[in-house]
Amino acid sequence: MNADMIAAWAVENGFQAIDSGNYRRHDNAGVITIEIKRMSFLLIDERQGLRPRLISRLFKDIPLTSGSGRLQGLLLDRNPKH
């Protein structure tokens, strides 16, 4: 993965560009922010009433073949099944 792939994934999944390398999405559960760095990205999950969850990954640790699936996996538990 690389910064361009993360940015494309963010836009495809409803994130709005805040500025260069930063994307944000609002939904009923709260706010998710993605900050793209030079060699990594930081996902900040701010759910209403809970402490923010920070997830940082190096691009080299996310294989190209399953990159978008792994990114989606980081968001899966946002809306737990009841």
Give residue spans per PLM region.
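Intrinsic low-complexity, intrinsically disordered segments enriched in polar/basic residues
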Residues: M1, I34, L75-L76
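Negatively charged, low-complexity tracts enriched in Asp/Glu with abundant Ser/Thr
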Residues: M1-R24
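N-terminal cationic leader/targeting segments used for protein routing and processing
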Residues: A3, G14, A29, R38, ...
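Mixed-charge, Lys/Arg-enriched low-complexity segments
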Residues: A8, R47-H82
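Intrinsic disorder/low-complexity segments
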Residues: V11, K37-M39, G67
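Glutamate identity and glutamate-enriched acidic tracts
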Residues: E12, Q16, E35, E46-Q48, ...
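Acidic, low-complexity, intrinsically disordered interaction modules
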Residues: H26-I62
